[in-house]
Amino acid sequence: MKDTYTVVAFDFRGHGEHYCENETDMSQDTLVNDAIQVFQSICTMFSDRSIVIVGHSMGGSIATKAAAKITGEHKGEAWARQLQGLFVIDVVEGSAMDALPFMENIVTSRPPEFKSLQSVVQYGIKSGTVKDLESARVSMPPQVVAKTDDVSGTTKYVWRTDLLATKPYWEGWFKGLT
């Protein structure tokens, strides 16, 4: 597969190790524009390739809206013609919208901090966020950042993104998919 395909993955603002000027603007329009900028860069790097966008959950919603904008507003541009497909995984507007009233409780029930990265991984498994240990080891640590207490010098791990601060954007991520 590596001889035929190139996989490029990026972290949205507020995710993983990506930092940007306005971390708290997680609006649909901002995330779509971020994704399009990444897509344009990929098209420049791989100008002779056809490109397929893949997105999961919120990323799938944003991928859908970015692909629509690329094939609509940008359809005459050479880079936009490289888009040859879209795969969306685990995004259904109805079920996503139905779950939104419960999201605040889910977010506030998470532990605010952890003593170690191992405890972050264990939380991912115990909470059902991730099903297997190897996946948890890959996907959970980028969701937290180390924070050192100035007085005691001890390090704890806190959530990378304040998910409650993104609440005003939740509906916009999923509305209009069907």
Predicted feature locations:
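Helix-loop "lid/cap" segments that line or gate small-molecule binding pockets
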Residues: 104-109, 119-131, 143-147
